[in-house]
A protein has these predicted regions:
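Active-site metal-coordination segments of metallo-dependent hydrolases
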Residues: 42-45, 143-147, 207-211
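Residues that cap or flank secondary-structure elements
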Residues: 3, 38, 95-96, 119, ...
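Membrane-anchoring hydrophobic helices of lipid-metabolizing enzymes
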Residues: 1-118, 152, 159-161, 305-309
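Catalytic core of membrane glycerolipid acyltransferases/transacylases, capturing the structured
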Residues: 110-169, 192-202
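Short glycine-/small-residue-rich flexible loop motifs, especially phosphate/cofactor-binding loops
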Residues: 12, 47-48, 128-129, 154, ...
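General small-molecule cofactor/ligand-binding pocket signal
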Residues: 49, 165, 244
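Non-catalytic C-terminal accessory region of glycerolipid acyltransferases
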Residues: 31, 38, 63-70, 105-109, ...
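Residue-level marker for well-ordered alpha-helical positions
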Residues: 44, 101, 125, 150-151, ...
Length: 309
């Protein structure tokens, strides 16, 4: 293990002894400076996203929302010590309630296979633990560019970690095989595909390049699709697992219809814990017109006033 990976690992273990409110205090101290640094990448991206999602919001309200989102970004970083820095079963004790478990139980009992769409919302690593504690699950993932981190991820997730399936041809075939046997797979639904490999569909009112893999798998296998996330409770009280049925049309043969339903499912999750979404992500960077500047580029160059939805 590389020295910097080992250092990160032992920092997580050391911070893991702290209660969640203390970790969030540290997270707030990390998130607030992102707001103070006007040209920080995280602030710029979050500000652009708020302009897209809330185009009619006045500047003061938008600034307050950006600040809140950046503080939650800090919380997302430090809460990893409570998840990866502890025994997995101890971390699961942070789950205080579950909403929508009846959908999950019914999907397992149906034997049709289950696709869990888990957006980058709240604490998705704790959601992985919760799912893995109830049923074997394989998650589709792209390995980190620096392979040294991959060993730490496997170690951190421990004995409750899901099976990790690479996002390549062999990995996708493994997902089909698992679903055909009535198994469970997890997919991050809002990862932006490469140009030409996705479908532009509305996301919070503006077309975004959307993955077609999940709708295609759902259409071809007949598996149930559910959305799920682990919401942070106020004042570090723990987490609430929320499970929602997928919108109608997510397995439609028409990809635009299916991807619109996929994005609507993500929206329904985000609307329940808005500031806990990963708003630092450049979700709308790729535009349908390749000659159109993406809004993040305009913002970085002081030209966000030219942006028109």
């Amino acid at each position: 293990m590389k020295w910097y990976v080992a250092l990160t690992w032992w920092m997580l273990r050391a911070l893991g002894v702290l209660p969640l409110p203390a970790l969030y205090a540290i997270g707030s101290a990390l998130g607030r400076p992102l707001w103070w640094r006007r040209h920080a990448r995280e602030r710029v991206h979050t500000d652009v996203n708020m302009r897209i999602v809330h185009p009619a919001m006045d500047a003061a309200a938008r600034d307050a929302l950006v600040r809140e989102c950046l503080v939650e970004t800090g919380h997302a970083v430090t809460e990893m010590a409570a998840v990866w820095g502890r025994d997995a079963r101890r971390a699961l004790k942070l789950v205080r309630e579950v909403e929508g478990q009846e959908y999950f139980d019914a999907a397992l009992q149906s034997g049709r296979g289950l696709i869990v769409a888990a957006p980058h919302l709240g604490c998705w690593e704790l959601l992985n633990y919760w799912l893995s504690a109830r049923t074997p699950i394989a998650i589709l993932y792209a390995p980190p560019r620096n392979r040294a981190w991959e060993a730490m991820l496997v170690r951190a997730r421990g004995d409750l970690g899901p099976e990790q399936v690479r996002a390549d041809g062999a990995g996708v075939r493994a997902l089909y095989k698992r679903l055909a046997a009535g198994g469970v797979v997890g997919i991050l639904p809002e990862q932006q595909p490469k140009r030409g490999e996705g479908q532009f569909a509305p996301f919070f009112g503006l077309d975004a390049n959307t993955m077609v893999l999940l709708p295609r798998i759902a259409q071809r296998t007949g598996a149930t699709v559910l959305f799920a996330f682990a919401e942070r409770l106020a004042r570090g009280a723990g987490f609430r697992i929320r499970i929602l049925p997928a919108p109608d049309g997510i397995a439609d043969p028409d990809l635009h219809t299916a991807c619109t339903a996929l994005n609507r499912g993500v929206e329904q999750c985000v609307e329940r814990a808005f500031s806990q979404y990963q708003w630092t992500y450049k979700r709308w960077a790729e535009r349908p017109d390749p000659n159109e500047h993406d809004p993040y580029w305009l913002a970085r160059n002081g030209r966000i006033g030219e942006w028109r939805q």
